Amino acid sequence: MGNLISLIFCCGRRQRSNIPPAMETAPLELPPNRFVFAAVPPYLNPNPNYVDQYPGNCLPPPVTEPPMLPYNFNHLHHYPPNSYQLPHPLFHGGRYPILPPPTYVHQKAVTIRNDVNLKKKTLTLIPDPENPNRLLVSFTFDASMPGRITVVFFATEDAECNLRATKEDTLPPITFDFGEGLGQKFIQSSGTGIDLTAFKDSELFKEVDTDVFPLAVKAEATPAEEGKSGSTNVQITQVVYTKEKGEIKIEVVKQILWVNKRRYELLEIYGIENTVDGSDEGKECVVCLSEPRDTTVLPCRHMCMCSGCAKALRFQTNLCPVCRQPVEMLLEINKNG
C-alpha cells in the first residue's frame, strides 16, 4: 500500500515538473578542403507545394516572363543583349543576315585622244553614176590633223592593225590623203567601184569562222613632225554585207583603235548624246533625277546614273536600272577631263 502511494506521488510530481530542455549538440564540422556531393542528385518537383515551403500560407509572387518584343519587317525577334545567338560575319548585330555587296567594280574612264574618227552611221554604198552595176563607198569623218585613208576589199587584219587585201589583183586598195577638218565627206572615185554580182554569196557574206572582212577602212592620222612617227593614231572599221529584201547593204561590226601600240575596241554608249549636246532635257540621273549622268553600266553600256547613285547601287542590286541586265562594271566618264 505504501509502495503504491509512493508510485502515484512520484508520477504526479513528474507531471507537474517542467520538461528539461533538449541537449544542444554541436554542429558537425567538415574538415577543410573537403566537399560533399550527392551520389544521385534528386529531381526537382515540377509542381512544388508552396504551402509547405512558405510558412503562414503566404504564396510567393508569380513568376513574370520577359515581354515578347515586337516583330520587325523581316519577321524576326529582337533578342535581348544577352541572347544565345553568336555573332557571324554575314549577320548584322547577330539577328538577321545581310547580303554581301556585288562583285562588280567602279572605275573611272581614261581619256584616249582619237585624231581621226569615221562616223560609222554614215558609211554606205552608192551607185556609180557612170557604171550603174558598180557601187562606190561613201562616208563622213572628222580629223584633228592630216592623214591618210585606205579602203580595202576582202581584207585581213594582223595584230598591229595592218590590213592586207586578199583579192589585190582584181580589187586593189584605194588610198587618199586628207587634211584637218570636221565633217569631211569621202566618196570613192567613179570607175573604181565594186560589182557585187561578180562574187559568190559565200564570199560576200562573211562566215563566223573566217578572218576575211568583205570591206575594211583604215584611217591613219600622220603628225606633221617627222620625229613623231611612233605616235601614229590608227582607226580600223570592219564592215560586212547584209541582204534585206533582195538589196545588199553594209553593216559595221567593229571599230578598232590603235594608239601607242595598244589595241582598243570602240563601243557605243547609249545616252551619252544627251549629256554633250548642250541640251538640259534627258541628261539627269534616272535614280535621283537631279544630278547629271556621268556613269556607264557595262556590258549593256547605258549611261544613266550619276557617280553618287552608282556607288550606292553597288550595295543594293547588281542590275542595270534601265534594262535590268546584270552589271559587271561601272565606268565613270568625266566629260571635262
From Swiss-Prot:
Post-translational modification: Myristoylated (in vitro).
Signal sequence range: none
EC supergroup of this enzyme: transferase
Keywords from the named record: Lipoprotein, Metal-binding, Myristate, Transferase, Ubl conjugation pathway, Zinc, Zinc-finger
Annotated pathway: Protein modification; protein ubiquitination
Annotated region (DAR2 domain), positions in chain: 139-255
A molecular-function term among this protein's GO annotations: ubiquitin protein ligase activity
GO BP term, example: protein ubiquitination
Gene3D superfamilies per the UniProt record, alphabetical: Zinc/RING finger domain, C3HC4 (zinc finger)
Source taxon at top rank: Eukaryota
EC number: 2.3.2.27
Zinc-finger ranges (RING-type): 285-324
Lipidation (N-myristoyl glycine): G2
Catalysed reaction equations from the record: S-ubiquitinyl-[E2 ubiquitin-conjugating enzyme]-L-cysteine + [acceptor protein]-L-lysine = [E2 ubiquitin-conjugating enzyme]-L-cysteine + N(6)-ubiquitinyl-[acceptor protein]-L-lysine
Primary role: Acts as an E3 ubiquitin-protein ligase, or as part of E3 complex, which accepts ubiquitin from specific E2 ubiquitin-conjugating enzymes and then transfers it to substrates (in vitro).
Domain notes for this protein: The RING-type zinc finger domain mediates binding to an E2 ubiquitin-conjugating enzyme.
Family: Belongs to the RING-type zinc finger family. LOG2 subfamily.
Protein name listed in UniProt: Probable E3 ubiquitin-protein ligase LUL1
